[in-house]
Design a protein with these regions (language model features):
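A short, basic N-terminal segment
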Residues: 1-40, 45, 355
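Short, locally clustered residues in the helix-turn-helix/winged-helix DNA-binding domain
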Residues: 34-35, 163, 255, 269, ...
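C-terminal helical "lid" of AAA+/P-loop NTPase domains
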Residues: 247-253, 259-273, 311-314, 346
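Conserved C-terminal helix/linker of AAA+ ATPases
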Residues: 270-293
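Conserved Walker B catalytic segment
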Residues: 127-196, 204
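P-loop NTPase nucleotide-binding core
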Residues: 38-39, 43-48, 52-156
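C-terminal leucine-rich, beta-strand-based interaction scaffolds used for sensing/assembly
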Residues: 2, 6-7, 292, 296-376
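Helix-loop-helix "sensor" segment of P-loop NTPases
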Residues: 201-252, 274-276
Length: 376
């Protein structure tokens, strides 16, 4: 039987430690916090590998055998009802592989939704609940935390993009969650977030409910040399390698951010290049191919913007990481008015085209940034 070879440079998800690069110290620290019954606020820019680290931690023997591990991403949630929906769905997905007794106990705790849970032809539960079925999010949240308290194993719950709850219309969500978490001794949480300023406020401001509730962890880019060795370890299995010069170019082109490096390495792994040693030109070719693949999606994305908003976005892309968008130099260089920039920046931030972090503005999508710079 022909075995399909797995591309070792994963872009999404987690397979096993073989396909996970480094993070030895971070994994040990996160595991130690969780096994010592501490909650953790994990703060780092998007696509640097927070979710991968969480899954890698959950894979550790001392974690996976002793805990129920649950991961949810709440980036797209808009209110408490959608949060509770995502949490319930995530719990069921984590418990289903563990057998009927385990998931049935959870479903029996959800009295408010019992009539809306369906089963497939094999008798396995399906999360057929609609968001509209959750009439009382607070009641369902109570039921979920009752499950956490009574579960047969302690639970570890990772909530990705946790800062999203600060934008919910219900203004007491932070306090509501904090109170329940504080009173639940059989569950511990990883609060993962990419908007560093918002996450820092949530966990270090005296006026916020989660003040001093968690150990705070940050993530830095993976060491360049370590990453190069990881890349060549896998490339060697197909009799290829990437030169140190080419990898350094790739690493710094994307500021060491894992997802973009993985994306290009994924393409290089299946490259039609005849060279055994992949060089800078191979990296450039892959990046150009990726931008070409994304072209129509980016055109549709930019169609949502007004001409002035697009003009400001292109200016930020061209500057790279400007610290001031209101300086006379910036306004004059790109022929922009102060009021135009103010209005555009507000929209671009709200729609996640750009981010403002540590005093600088950047495009959230580095491929889009390169694409816009090429247009000019």
């Amino acid at each position: 039987m022909l075995m399909v070879q797995t591309n070792p440079f994963l872009i999404e998800g987690y397979l096993s430690p073989d396909f996970f690069c480094d993070r030895v110290e971070e994994t040990a620290l996160l595991t130690r916090h969780l096994t010592n019954r501490c909650n953790v606020a994990l703060i780092a820019p998007r696509r640097l590998g927070k979710s991968g680290l969480i899954y890698h931690c959950f894979y550790q023997k001392e974690i996976r055998e002793q805990y129920h591990c649950i991961y949810i991403d709440i980036y797209d949630t808009k209110n408490l009802g959608e949060f509770v929906y995502a949490l319930g769905k995530g719990i069921l997905a984590a418990l289903k592989p563990k057998g009927r007794k385990v998931w049935e106990f959870f479903l029996n705790m959800l009295q408010s939704l019992k009539s809306t849970i369906s089963f497939d032809i094999n008798g396995n539960p399906e999360w057929s609940v609609g968001i509209g079925d959750i009439q009382s999010p607070d009641i369902m949240l109570d039921e979920i935390f009752a499950y956490f308290s009574q579960a047969d194993k302690p639970c570890l719950i990772a909530i990705d993009e946790f800062q999203t709850i600060a934008g919910y219309p219900e203004k007491t969500v932070e306090a509501t969650l904090r109170k329940r978490i504080q009173n639940c001794h059989n569950a511990h949480f990883i609060f993962s977030g990419s908007k560093r300023h918002m996450m820092a406020l949530m966990f270090t401001s005296r006026s916020r409910p989660f003040y001093h509730s968690s150990s705070i962890m940050g993530l830095e880019a993976i060491n360049e040399q370590t990453y190069l060795e990881f890349a060549n370890h896998h490339l060697s299995k197909i009799n290829k390698e990437i030169s140190a010069e080419a990898f350094s170019y790739l690493y710094h082109r994307f500021d060491g951010i894992t997802w973009y490096i993985q994306y290009v390495l994924n393409m290089l792994y299946t490259s039609i290049s005849d060279s055994r040693v992949l060089g800078k030109e191979d990296v450039e070719y892959c990046i150009e191919s990726i931008l070409l693949q994304h072209r129509f999606a980016y055109q549709a994305l930019l169609f949502q913007l007004t001409s002035k908003q697009k003009q400001v976005l292109i200016a930020i892309a061209r500057e790279g990481s400007p610290s001031s968008l209101m300086s006379q130099e910036f306004l004059h260089k790109y022929r922009l008015g102060a009021s135009t920039v103010q209005g555009a920046v507000k929209t671009l931030l709200e729609r996640d085209f750009i981010t403002q972090d540590e005093g600088v503005y950047q495009l959230c999508d580095k491929f889009l940034k390169l694409s816009l710079r090429e247009e000019i």
